[in-house]
Amino acid sequence: MMEKNSKIYVAGHRGMVGSAIVRELKKQGYNNIVVRTHNELDLLCQKDVEGFFSEEKPEYVFLAAAKVGGILANESALADFMYDNIMLEMNVIHSAWKNGCKKLEFLGSSCIYPRLAKQPMKEECLLTGELEKTNEAYALAKISGLKYCEFLNRQYGTDYISVMPTNLYGPNDNYHPMHSHVLPALIRRFHEAKIEGKRSVTCWGDGSPLREFLYVDDLANLCVFLMNHYSGNETVNAGTGKELSIWELTDLVANIVGYHGSIEWDLSKPNGTPRKLLDISKATKLGWVYKTELEDGIRLAYQDFLDNPIRAER
């Protein structure tokens, strides 16, 4: 279990997940948190990462750094998504092991599970079927990271754990029109349509896919909880256990943003995986419960978007 003065490194502290973990750690009284910006430490450079771990010797590591994006970003940069994510994961995990890190927590994604996996998806369904093609590169990279943690545990007795979150949203999200995920993309799209007085907004696909969403501060709470209370080779799913269709989501976001025009659907665009709902029974049996309902979380996320307009340009 982490002490309040344990040296804790959060990789990716400027991203949505990493910044939420830092907030949660500070909220709980941890006072020796180490972070580095990309300019200070390029996680793709093995030499630099090894030098950082050799000098700092963090006792605990939260690996929240990743190259992320929605369907468009993933499909247009398959090689980049695979290379960048595998390299940064391996550099951090391997350097942590070489320098005696007590415990590491790897943040993955629910996209690691098969496209047509039985719902809700249990942790053990990993590698039992074909992946969703629109984010296959990212999924394979994340699978590599969690498997490397598992293999280090099995071969060297390390205590490295993996968490697989569902779709995330909340403060410090990425609202870029080309690189964002569905929920922040909808927030931006409906906000701009409201400001510009557009009569209609067009969304991808037909609205039928079912999705689950978890507020990022709830994930951060789980991450700290697991670092202190869980060890094992099995991954732990992070979600709410609740789902809604993309059609229902667009209607909810439009109402919260205050857009009252019509919503149209571009059937030439891909839907992605038809359904993604995580089985979160493992996390709940450990004693964790999420706190933020979707409508409340979207209101908080929209306010964060309004308070920080520069995020829309990332």
Residue map of PLM features:
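NAD(P)H-binding glycine-rich loop region in Rossmannoid oxidoreductase-like domains
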Residues: 46-86, 95-98
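Conserved catalytic-site region of short-chain dehydrogenase/reductase
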Residues: 71, 106-121, 137-143, 155, ...
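Active-site Tyr-X1-5-Lys
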Residues: 133-166, 185-196
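Adenosine-cofactor binding site in Rossmann-like domains, unifying the SAM/SAH pocket
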Residues: 26-51
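Conserved Rossmann-fold NAD(P)-dependent oxidoreductase catalytic core, especially the SDR/UDP-sugar
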Residues: 4, 90-135
